[in-house]
Amino acid sequence: MATSAIQQSAFAGQTALKQSNELVCKIGAVGGGRVSMRRTVKSAPTSIWYGPDRPKYLGPFSDQIPSYLTGEFPGDYGWDTAGLSADPETFAKNRELEVIHCRWAMLGALGCVFPEILSKNGVKFGEAVWFKAGSQIFSEGGLDYLGNPNLIHAQSILAIWACQVVLMGFVEGYRVGGGPLGEGLDPIYPGGAFDPLGLADDPDAFAELKVKEIKNGRLAMFSMFGFFVQAIVTGKGPIENLFDHLADPVANNAWAYATNFVPGK
């Protein structure tokens, strides 16, 4: 009888949790208008990447993990030598900044390599190397998107600068200022219209995707740093540097360039 009671209690708890997780959106009338809101339901992920038994930054050789790093959030490997996450408010702010920079870095890394890949496969560009492409706007013909003047044709660096400042500055200022458009939404994972494929509908799958995003984003940030260094040292794009390394790994590697690099030459 006791076993039956425990099973019934567990089943009831699972049913309540499922109903709670399924209630993601709530439509209500506010001032005669309709406002779509997403309610974030926090449940303990079953993934190996969360909780006290999650993988640590040095595996079994990791030192004492700070008590405030409990494995609640994605990407927590228990490493915080500088104590940057000790304050909860600072931790929340840094988490948001990291995810935003991860997403920018992933887009940036794709933008650095994709034009070179297309160029090497026959697509004509004015300049496919990422750090040289912008200078095409100063050429006589201006800058054509994908080398096609019928798509986006830019000739004024001032117009490009104004668009960047006005459009991106406005959006970023709105985000930082906490505009009413995002009220009731998670600032990092808003869902709703920002998740048209419904990737976050399954809580366990969503927890896994958060980990994948942060891991790939951190890798992308390191990649972008590497692309910057490559541009300064070799004057070539990442794909061309890769081909050079594959052709002659001994002469074209980080150690060889570091020992022979002379600034300004």
Curated annotation (Swiss-Prot):
Annotated transit peptide: 1-37
Ligand binding (chlorophyll b 2): R103, I152, L181
UniProt membrane topology term: Multi-pass membrane protein
Binding site for chlorophyll a 2: H101
Tissue: Present at high levels in leaves and cotyledons.
Comment field on protein domains: The N-terminus of the protein extends into the stroma where it is involved with adhesion of granal membranes and post-translational modifications; both are believed to mediate the distribution of excitation energy between photosystems I and II.
Residues where chlorophyll b 3 binds: S156, E172
Gene label: CAB-151
Induction, per UniProt: Markedly increased by light.
Binding site residues for chlorophyll a 1: W79, S85, E98, R218
Protein name: Chlorophyll a-b binding protein 151, chloroplastic
Positions annotated to bind chlorophyll a 4: N216
Amino-acid positions noted as binding chlorophyll b 1 in the UniProt annotation, renumbered to this chain: Y57
Positions with a binding annotation for chlorophyll b 5: Q164, F261
Chain sites annotated for binding chlorophyll a 3: Q136, L146, E213
Species the sequence originates in: Gossypium hirsutum
Residues involved in chlorophyll a 5 binding: K212, Q230
Binding site for chlorophyll b 4: Q164, R175
GO BP field: photosynthesis, light harvesting in photosystem I; response to light stimulus
Transmembrane intervals: 99-119, 151-171, 219-239
InterPro entries documented for this protein: Chloro_AB-bd_pln (IPR001344), Chloroa_b-bind (IPR022796)
Signal peptide: none
